[in-house]
Structures are given as structure tokens and as C-alpha cells.
Amino acid sequence: GDCLLIRCTFPKDKPVEFLFPVRLAYEPIKTATHLSNHGIYLKKHEVVTVMDYMIKWGTVMSNEIEADIIRNQMGWTDDNRTSFVIGDREYKRDGTVAQTPFSAITDKIGKHMIPKGTFEDWKKAANQLDTPGMELHQYAMLTGFASPLMAYTNTDGAIVCLTGETGAAKTGALFSAVSIWGNPKVLYVHAKKGGTFNALKGRISTLHNMTYAHDEVTNLDAEDVSELSHMISTGKPKLKMQASINAERDFESSASMIALFTSNKSIYDKLSALKHDPNGEVARIIEFMLGQPKILQTDLNFGKRVFEKIGRAHV
């Protein structure tokens, strides 16, 4: 339903922005609860006044301006690829750029895709990969640019896995691809046992066409690696039933991207240990073995350091 984008300033604290569903303006308790969740505390008699205020503003704006569309995914907005969402901006085919409010789904990652730094700074960082022995690191960076182009192909998704021992700058290569779209230190996923697999699926769905970067998939269970490979290559998760009733769960949004993994050990070997014939999964993954380039023998953090504080290439 329709929402109002609320910006509230406080005497001491930082301003906050959030979406207020207009339907809540007809229910005092839900209005008060929603506002209190964002640090706005009202007395009982003030709640009705605020409700009236929200309804009036909603009416005025619906009569005077066209509503912005809240997107639940980054990347292409439709099958015709008429516009592309990055953070809170929607870049349209006609050259215009529209603001798009974050939804509850995109808020956690969208705010880390706000343009910062300069393209010149990013190019300087990227050009440091133009070093003998770092050709595969360059390739990994270019998967970040190639990921949105998967929507133009007959293949929904692909996985590139960088495998090698510690010190091969695998994470630096990962950062280089993610830095195209936003802050790599926040947007990449580091695998640890006990993580929520549903959260990983949600991240893939939200990124939609941007590179999904997963560091150290060695720490994932083989079953999870198998399911991730299926989901990324087909563009959607497996069908599952609802827990309480005999019915399929609601449709989950699809994705079309290139995912970038890193691993200390061969991901092919990991899948082979899971089943006798892992060819279905192996066919979905391209694995490259990385050695340690000479430059990293004296500077182990070269790749990661270069990309962790730079601008965004998409601007």
C-alpha cells in the first residue's frame, strides 16, 4: 500500500528517515507503536493529531504529485530493463534519475550503495590490479560489471570461485567486484558456521542483478553450497511447503547475476564429498586456482586495502 517517507529531526540525536504505511493512520495503537519504534514518543491525545496530519498530507500529495515506486530489489526493474536501481536511485533508460525510497527489504544493503568518493579514485585503485600475476584478480573485478548483463542472456546465473591458500588476495579480488556498487566491507558475506541460510537467500534476492560476494565458502556445509549453486544458476530458490498447512510458500523473487565465491579448498572436492555424482553442481561453478602474486609476498593486504575505502564505479 501507499507509504509516506517521514524524516524526523531531534534536538540531540541524528535525524531519522522511515516509511509510514498510510493504512496505520486509521489505527491509533499501530500508529503510536510504529512511531515509537523510530524514537518518536507521543502522548495519547497527540496520536490522533498526528494521524490526521498523516491522512491530510497523504491526500494532498496524491492529488499533486506522482508517487515514487518503492523497489524491493536492486538492479533491473522489469524484463524490458527500462531502469536500474542502485541504492536509493533509479537510473532510467531516458537518462533521468529518480529517487526511490528504501523498502524494509532493501534498507539494510541499499544505504551502503549511496555514491561516495570519486570515479577517479576508484580507477586508481582498480589500475593497481594491472600487475603481472594478478590477471585472475582483474577477471574477478570484471565479474562485477558483467553481473547485470546476465539478464541479457539465456542463463539465469553463474558462479566464479577463487580458490587458494591464505595470502592469495582472494578477499581483495572479492572487494574489487563489490566496490563497483557500494561499500565492499559491508556488502560482502563472510561464511561462518551457524549462519542463517535463509538470510543468504534473501541477500541474493535483494541484490537481484548485482554481484553476490561470499567469502570463505569453505566454512559452509556442502548441502548449503549445493543449494546456493542451484539457486544462483536457476535464478530462484527451490520450491518449499509452508510449515503449518499443506501449501506452497509464497513466490520468492528471482535473481539473475554472477556470484563470486572464495575458498581455501577446492569447491569441487567439497561437492564430491557430498554425493557420488556432483556434476549438476559442478557444471554451475567455474573455479580458478589462485597462487600468491609476487607483490603480495611483501604486502599481504594489498588487494583488500586498495578497495576498502574507495569510491563507487557505477556513478
Question: Could you say what each language-model-derived stretch is?
Answer:
Residues 313-315:
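Conserved small/polar residues in nucleotide/adenosyl-binding loops
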Residues 161, 173-225:
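AAA+/P-loop NTPase substrate/partner-engagement loops
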Residues 1-132, 202, 207, 272:
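Conserved glycine-centered beta->alpha loop in an early N-terminal alpha/beta scaffold
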Residues 226-242, 249:
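Conserved catalytic/switch belt of AAA+ P-loop NTPases
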Residues 96-187:
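P-loop NTPase catalytic core of nucleic-acid-dependent motor ATPases
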